[in-house]
Amino acid sequence: MVIAEFSYPFFIEKLTPVSREKCLVKYQCSYSARVTATREKPQILFSITVPIITTYPGSLSEDAGGLLGQLSEIKLEVRLRENFYPEDLVEMVERHALVPVYSFLTSEDQAWMIKKIHTECKSSITVTDEIKNDLAHTKEIEWYKVQCFNYGMLQHYSTVIGTEKSMWVPFSGYDSDDV
């Protein structure tokens, strides 16, 4: 078996949510190619890690403003049927996040994010499931794995949840007629 791996940082210029200031956000990407025989087509996987904010599971949703956020990282691994761009995967993840992560925030942006984090609930389980559903309905993606790593900044904990497409797991993928 021959394995070749290549990792690199990928930057996207984004606008902050309120002040519309430009900032660069870094995402870690990698390609992994594996082949077991010379006549076999290599298996190529692409992965990207996207930082987001999700709701801390111990938050008190019944108290006004009682929700807390946690830093989460979504790691996507995909095997593609055809070209797909890292920006598309980042957009997919951030669309389902409670709040995306920015490298720069003004005080107006911080206030907006804090208010959203304390008033809206979006668990890492919900985010992972929504991303899985999007990937399962994306015809360019042959196989996927979604992992959500969660880090408690005040409570000093870390957790991980994940799912992947499997022919043995019902509803982890959809037939091409359904896409």
Residue spans of the language-model regions?
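N-terminal intrinsically disordered, cationic/polar leader segments
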Residues: 1-179
